[in-house]
Amino acid sequence: MDIVSQLEAVMPTELVGSVVRTAGMTVSVADFPAPVGALAEIRRQTGPPLAAEVIGFRDELTVLYPFRELVGVRRGNRVRLTRTSRWLRVGNELLGRVIDAQGKAVDGKAEPALSDRTSFRRQPPHPCDRPRIRAALTTGIRAIDGLLTCGKGQRMGVFSASGVGKSVLLGMMARHTDADVIVICLVGERGREVNEFIERELGPAGLARSVVVVATSNEPALVRVHAASTATAIAEYFRDQGKDVLLLMDSLTRFALAQREIGLAAGEPPTTRGYPPSVFALMPQLVERTGRSPQGSITAFYAVLVEADDPNEPISDAVRGLLDGHVWLSRKLASRGHYPAIDVLESLSRLMPDVTSDEHRQAAVTIRQLLAAYRDHEDLISIGAYRRGANPTVDVAVDMQEPIHGYLCQRVEERSTAEESSGSLLRLKREAAQRLGAAQSASAAGQSPPGAAQAAPRAQPGAPTPAASPR
């Protein structure tokens, strides 16, 4: 931000109001005509001033939402306007650091010396200025790089119920991706999980090229909402430097819940399942800031916590329409020890055709067809009622379950390059094609394939590769 913009953000005269009442976490102030989004401080009689933000108006009063608890606030306290807009200090020195929603270090180290500034809430790149996405981003996870290939600048959702392993999956991406910079936003996390994620899921190597923005569940809703904007602003800064950035947010659901608190406190009417309109207005504003620009790219993965395993609950349903694809984590697969528990048939990457070769896409289609054929007949197979030879495709699907699951399962510390993921996928396709040809020939001759049993195995296929359990 240039010096002119900085000067314009500072009010030329002091604007002062007084506290009239509090309601929940909001403070109503009289004689304080500050704009929405402006920053103010409440002068308490004891303790330092309390920072707050203008979130709306009610009758003749201005409604503020504080960044900390309201302890010490009383009727008549003076409220002073401090700034009408916000910016962040940024720079390469943020790499390897853990910061809060205000950009301050919380990792016990000295504050980084940052010389650059960026706007806290930037406008997304103009649609006509966005280049097409044509290059793939390697996540290091075979199930994604092989069957759900993502492009640099794509926005994906990771949908799962609690305890299925989405945090572990995001940590694997941060460790194994080929992105230049990783920005991780932990919104509404339990306090104990922050260090666990940094030390166990991310590791020293992942942290060295990452910026971690943290707002735990005990912090006010405004802080949790700002954490998402702070992380996105930092990702935008590195994108402007020509970097390919990977933004990981856990989770977009908690961001929506925090905005619901703010919206209801500001007097918005509750709509679908108690969510006010501002939630559904704010999510696309946040998501559209990511993507590709003429300088670089921000590839974003947003974790979405699915309430009661219902994929059609309001937040999940709205987010699917905003993003360029989704990765669905299955509790059923997780219960079988299949990690990462990615349900390939329920997942989708809309940009995969633009960033993969024809051969790769055909191989992915073949594996999907085999997985679908097995799922359609799984009940018959599990009770031994399926008769081998009745359907050559199902016969091959049964035979290929072990190698396919071996491809999809992956240990946390295991990294698969793009070449390895693609090469293994093509080998699976060739093996499936050979088996299908033999099965079709045997079916035409009225015989079972050589060495095949007459009935499909009754046992459920397990994951042959050991993997870490989710949190």
Model-derived segments and their meaning:
Residues 146-147, 153-471:
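P-loop NTPase catalytic core
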Residues 1-3, 24-27, 41, 59-60, ...:
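A broad, low-specificity signal for short, low-complexity segments enriched in glycine/proline
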Residues 1-139:
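Acidic-enriched and Gly/Ser
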Residues 2-3, 80, 139-144, 231, ...:
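Phosphate-interacting basic helix/loop segments used at nucleotide- and nucleic-acid interfaces
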